């Protein structure tokens, strides 16, 4: 969490995720995984001093956070970050995080269901954790990297 002034919110979500996994509560895991992604995005935007609407929907929030550290489609930095293959993987990570939001809307905590939900298994919980991990690690490692694209160009505009 290098460079994040107050990573406490991330640690809270990680602790809740761990407990929900231990308790075999896939709905709670899915909800917490989505919240971890949102929290990571907002913390990075705060660190970069980028304004955002706290009620911003997930897709624009993630895009804004990715753009703030140079992980957007239009980034033309020299080096490997410019490669189509790298950008394709980065886009995939963003899509994975969006899939997590959609899974949470259907099965996770945060929206009261009109009927009993069924079918979720531990494997779905683990999938949600891995989706959140992929996106959050990508964001946090890029944010803390001394050679990350955002350190060499003005991306706040």
How would you name each of these model-derived features?
Residues 1-29, 39, 43, 149-157:
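Charged alpha-helical initiation segments
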Residues 5, 50, 77-80, 110, ...:
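Long amphipathic alpha-helical segments
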Residues 9, 28-32, 40, 57, ...:
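Residue-level detector of well-ordered alpha-helical segments, enriched
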Residues 12-19, 79-85, 113:
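Short, charged/polar, low-complexity loop and linker segments
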Residues 14, 18-21, 40-44, 69, ...:
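A structural signal for well-ordered alpha-helices, especially hydrophobic packing surfaces
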Residues 29-32, 43-61, 149-151:
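Short acidic alpha-helical/loop segments enriched in Asp/Glu that coordinate divalent cations
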Residues 49-93:
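Short, charged amphipathic alpha-helical segments flanked by flexible coils
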Residues 86-150:
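Charge-enriched, short contiguous segments at helix-coil
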